[in-house]
């Protein structure tokens, strides 16, 4: 007796499942498949930008304010719901799943600025860009050289930043810089964050940008930025100098802010892999060779089984880590684990999906190549796989002298 195949999209597990979460997941899924996917299939091959209309609709649905307090217009939900929405959007286009994180930068601003910009951010009308990496400082954040020199009324920023995605369209650039000269014996000392406010579509005085040509992550542009006596007012220093007395407080602030982005990246990785799996399941039932659908062959069926199993395992860990984060638990190690495992899985699964599609997968006629290109990036940004392994091992083993 024949039976219909099961839906590869697993429901939220019983311990975490609520009616509200089911509704949020279904809303995000419907929006992703009906609105985002057609736009992605049209614009990504030509390196087009995410349309303003799509961003506006995302704001109306609350995607930019998932974790923002209700008094600012946000939904005041948790990392768990954030991950649910991210996976669904990433299944269609990772860039759209990524842009919802840009509103969160308003949460780290000083109180007066937070009051002004957060209500706009939760509607997607004020979004940020993060400028941390430099030509000589990628994984080694403590080696940043961009300087912040104190002057009357504020600071002057000088230096270069790399991989600043959305820098042109952002309303604010959050810059990691030093307010003290670099000291190789105290590398973590003097690292601070500065909010550089600007008009969307332009760079402020003292800032210039050159777009970086990428093989993926289209939908928005990524820049190398140069800061040349860029003036930042005193109230744009994130965290008061008086409150942050520890020499490495700024570094710790930047490092501590990485847990939620790593869960976010795990969700993006899972969404990409799921898109590749779902497309592969459909393809193998249509594509025929040797007189029958290739989905009838054991080699293909086992590929599908392995892909689905890997996705499910990573999703289960993501749910656990997200729930723990919402409960206030420290998730430095588990956040690194889920980011590491999910990104590695995503590259394997999307590559296997391309193999299943054969030559067709190596064309822009199918979105598989987009999932494959974008999945490769998840092993690099928000901390490389090697840095994730370093974080995990440092939690499990005594400190190494090789620093």
Could you describe each region identified by the protein language model?
Residues 2-13, 84-85, 101, 247, ...:
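Glycine-rich phosphate/cofactor-binding loops in nucleotide/flavin-utilizing enzymes
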Residues 13-20, 24, 207-312, 378, ...:
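Glycine-rich beta->alpha junctions and the first turn(s) of the following alpha-helix
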Residues 37-46, 281, 285-292, 308-341, ...:
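C-terminal helix-coil-helix/basic helical segment that borders enzyme active sites and/or dimer interfaces
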Residues 60-125, 166-172, 325-329, 370-373:
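Internal helix-loop-helix
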Residues 124-132, 176:
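A short, Trp-centered hydrophobic/proline-enriched beta-strand micro-motif
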Residues 146-149:
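A structural signal for short hydrophobic beta-strand segments in well-ordered beta-sheet cores
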Residues 158-207:
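A short core secondary-structure module
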Residues 162-168, 261, 377-384:
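Glycine-rich phosphate/pyrophosphate-binding beta-alpha loops
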């Amino acid at each position: 007796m024949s039976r219909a195949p099961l839906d590869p999209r697993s429901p939220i597990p019983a311990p975490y499942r609520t009616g509200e979460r089911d509704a949020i997941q279904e809303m995000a899924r419907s929006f992703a498949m009906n609105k985002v996917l057609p736009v992605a299939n049209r614009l990504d091959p030509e390196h087009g930008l995410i349309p303003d209309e799509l961003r506006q609709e995302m704001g109306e649905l609350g995607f930019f304010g998932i974790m923002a307090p209700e008094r600012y217009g946000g939904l005041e939900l948790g990392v768990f719901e954030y991950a649910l929405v991210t996976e669904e959007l990433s299944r269609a286009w990772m860039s759209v799943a990524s842009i919802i994180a840009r509103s969160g930068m308003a949460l780290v601003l000083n109180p007066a600025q937070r009051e002004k910009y957060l209500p706009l951010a939760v509607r997607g009308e004020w979004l940020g860009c993060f400028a941390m990496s430099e030509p000589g400082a990628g994984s080694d954040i403590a080696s940043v050289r961009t300087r912040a020199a104190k002057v009357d009324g504020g600071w002057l920023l000088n230096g270069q930043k790399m991989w600043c995605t959305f820098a042109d369209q952002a309303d604010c650039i959050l810059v990691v810089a030093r307010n003290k000269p670099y000291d190789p014996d105290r590398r973590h000392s003097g690292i601070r964050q500065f909010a550089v406010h600007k008009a969307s579509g332009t760079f402020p005085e003292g800032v210039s940008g050159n777009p970086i040509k990428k093989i993926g992550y289209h939908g928005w542009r990524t820049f190398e930025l140069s800061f040349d006596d860029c003036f930042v007012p005193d109230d744009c220093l994130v965290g008061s100098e008086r409150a942050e007395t520890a020499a490495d407080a700024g570094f710790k602030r930047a490092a501590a802010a990485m847990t939620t982005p790593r869960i976010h990246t795990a969700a993006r990785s899972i969404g990409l892999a799921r898109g590749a799996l779902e497309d592969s399941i459909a393809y193998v039932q249509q594509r025929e060779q040797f007189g029958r659908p290739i989905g009838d062959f054991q080699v293909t069926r086992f590929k599908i089984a392995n892909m689905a199993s890997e996705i499910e395992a990573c999703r289960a860990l993501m749910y656990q880590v997200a729930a723990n984060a919402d409960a206030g638990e420290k998730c430095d190690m588990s956040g690194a684990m889920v980011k590491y495992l999910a990104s590695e899985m995503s590259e394997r699964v999307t590559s296997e999906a391309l193999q299943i599609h054969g030559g067709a997968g190596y064309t822009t006629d199918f979105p598989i190549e987009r999932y494959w290109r974008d999945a490769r990036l998840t092993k690099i940004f928000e901390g490389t796989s090697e840095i994730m392994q370093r974080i995990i091992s440092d939690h499990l083993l005594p400190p190494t002298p090789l620093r």
